[in-house]
Structure formats: C-alpha cells, structure tokens
Regions:
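Structured beta-strand segments within beta-sheet-rich domains
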Residues: 68-95
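Exposed extracellular interaction/assembly regions and N-terminal maturation sites
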Residues: 1-70, 100-129
Length: 129
C-alpha cells in the first residue's frame, strides 16, 4: 500500500487493509469505495494492539434521499473501521476514507460514506488485540 495515493476498494467480497504501525511519519492513506461490497465488508484496521484511531465519520443515511446525515467520532480505544456494503455502516460506491499517521500510536481517520438505509451504526470499533 502506497501513501500519498488513492487505494480503491474494488471487490464485491470486500477487502481488509492493515495500516502500518503509527510512528508519526505524517503519511496519509486515502481509500475510495469503488465497488459496493455485497458480501463481507471493506475493513481498515491498525497494525497492533497499541495503535488507535481518532477522528470522525459523516454518513449519508440513505442513498435514495438527500439531506439526512449521521456523524460519529471514534471512541477511545477504537482501532478498526468496517464499511459493510449496503448495510448500516456505510460502504456504498463513492465513499472516501483518509487515515493520517500523525503521532506514534495514533491514526487520524476521517470518512464520508453512504448507507443503503436502516438503523445506521458507527463503523468504528475495537477489534485488534
């Protein structure tokens, strides 16, 4: 995975990306959802149990309706973002995610995505051990 480039999520079966260990390099990784994952999910996670994600996500609640947005921020200890296709955590074509290695142990992650409807939920979680 190259920093300063855009990585496309392009598989209907989803993709799992593991970010490098956060050391404060200033490297920025950008992801675009080019294909909606219809099984599994597109997942971005940190490299180890000590790195965490800061940041926030803006999600358009329903791709068929304008003007309805949901916002979430990462909780302390969150280390994973999951974009489950047409489900409630986003993952529809056109979504954009950016993760910056801004200091040792910390990633700043922002995302702008859409969901297919339903009861939307945060894509942030703590799964790396």
């Amino acid at each position: 995975m190259l920093f300063r480039s855009v990585v496309q999520f392009g598989k209907t079966t989803g993709t799992i990306v593991t970010l490098p260990a956060a050391t404060g390099t200033g490297n920025i990784y950008r992801f675009v959802i080019g294909v909606t994952a219809t099984s599994n999910a597109n997942i971005i996670k940190v490299a180890n149990a000590t790195d965490v994600m800061d940041g926030s996500l803006c999600l358009q609640q329903d791709t068929d309706a304008d003007g309805t947005l949901k916002l979430w921020r990462a909780d302390a200890g969150d280390d994973t973002m999951t974009f489950a296709g047409a489900a409630t955590t986003g993952g529809i074509v056109g979504g954009f995610i950016q993760c910056a290695d801004y200091k040792a142990g910390f990633w700043s992650c922002q995302a702008w995505t859409q969901s297919g409807g339903g009861s939307e939920a945060t894509p942030f979680s703590a799964t790396v051990s």
